[in-house]
Amino acid sequence: MDSLIAALSAGQTYRSDWNKNALPTTAQVAGQWYDLSTGAGNPMMNSIIGSSANLAHQAITETTSITAASGALGGSIAGTVFTDTTHGSGRFTVGMALSGTGVVAGTYITSLGTGTGANAGGTYNVNISQTVTSQTITGTAVAGGLPHGGDVGALNKHLLNASAFSSATTTAPAIMMLYDMLACYTITSVTTTGAQSFTGQAAWARYADGSGVRAFLVPSVVMGAGSPTVQLSYTNSASVAGRLTPAAPSLPVINTTAPVGSIAYAGTGVGKYGPFLPMMAGDAGIKSVQSINFSATMTSGVMNLVICKPLAYMPITTVGVASERDFVNMLPSMPRIYDGACLHWAMYAGAATPVNSSFMGHIDTAWA
């Protein structure tokens, strides 16, 4: 406690206010989990999800960015429609910032048009109306994490307080979960069945031993009509390989036409879990992932396996009333925030939540 008081006295503290919107086109269903990192607001949308190569390991920190280099060799913007006529490399995703000669600063993709978010052409809707003639247009994806005070080197940073609330109708009850996003694997091969191996594996930059690390699936492009089961092969935090998502009582079942931002298998009933993919009995975390197996085609869409470390939970019990947590005096207390942490919120909808509902709050951190 003395070191905490000294840190506060020395100004080694940071307050970060946030405001995130829920799904922009689809109401949130009661009984399901949603990843608010894919929503607009402050911090900005996480467009890293869905941007990397198929099945490839993408490490994530608060400053991670991915550039679709020469993404559109023949790209143009008319009004609020960006057209990728002659595609170069990489893929365009919702939330990705666009740049090029004459492109207005701050332009980003708000939604898909005829473009699919895959390595192909098509149209995408943008936030600023403008006219840009055919040229090379580049897209840059960012992680959009909640600021927490920057790197502190040899010092230890901890979460002191947090709050969350919403004034939108029927946004309560809800449960908010703060997590650190460690890595992501974009899965564009959603019509492939059987085990698909991940590539470019590397240790998690934070929580390298895997203790407490979990995984969930979230679409970055709305999924098609398929509803397969899913099984993850992983190595646990005790370095035991060959662990599998348990088949009993049931493997997780992907929701048909799962929308962007939804935890793809969350809900109520057989095969519904949330927010995380179940682990085998006795496992305390995920050290690495080896493959993923879908039992049937999902027809279309882009799925993403997100690796994360959950840090804190808090309930929102009443619309317009803030939920607050004092992590200094609660046990277990003061979750550590590592350098490079990419903090995001997930939400469990206890009631049908209207389209584009706003959630807001803050966190306080300190380091000593």
Regions found by a protein language model. Give the residues of each.
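Aromatic- and glycine-enriched beta-alpha-beta binding-site module
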Residues: 206-238
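Extended assembly-interface regions of large multimeric machines
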Residues: 1-67, 141-219
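Extended, low-complexity, turn-rich repeat/linker tracts enriched in Gly/Pro/Ser/Thr and Asp/Glu
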Residues: 149, 166-169, 220-227, 298-301, ...
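C-terminal interaction-tip segments
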Residues: 1-14, 18-22, 240, 302-368
